Amino acid sequence: RAREWRALDSLFFEDTTVESKKLFENILQDDNSILKDFSIATLKLQKYRNNLEEEINELMELIAPNITALTGSLLGARLIALAKGIENLALMPGSRIQLLGSKKAFFKNKKNKLLPPKHGAIYQHPLIKGAPWWQRGKISRSLGSKIALASKIDFFSKKYIGDKLNEDFNNRVEKIHQQYPNAPKKMRIIRRNKR
């Protein structure tokens, strides 16, 4: 947006390949106060976000190292927040962890008589997000069960086996990729009218 405003302000600004941080720093040198204020606010927001991510990384390494090794600190923290605590996450089955964060989609699909969602917040995991659509449900189920195991270990025993869990999960994903390389043929479901 700052690039668009700058382009409107100056017809000579045609370099659209300028990185965002450099763009904001260039705008700070100008005397247009609106763009300057916007650039300052954006740079502060980026700095705040980076500091927040570092803080979450440190806390997750202390609180839930196995979950962090399996999902990453940001996704792990989001799952703990959705479960309202690591204790609740540790007591959940893998199938519920798989669907954490999909409440709106679940009830929307139920209302419209569609199939329920296969994954919730764990869709943000790169191995699920990057997988073909027909493999995502299987990978989500596997990740949900591994997160359930990791959260139980983090809450009850504090023993670190995150690397082994991550290796097992990656092996399972490879097996899914090999077992289901092609998309299944879509079947048309014929429903009979109830009379």
PLM feature segments, named:
Residues 26-74:
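Helix-hairpin-helix/helix-loop-helix acidic hairpins
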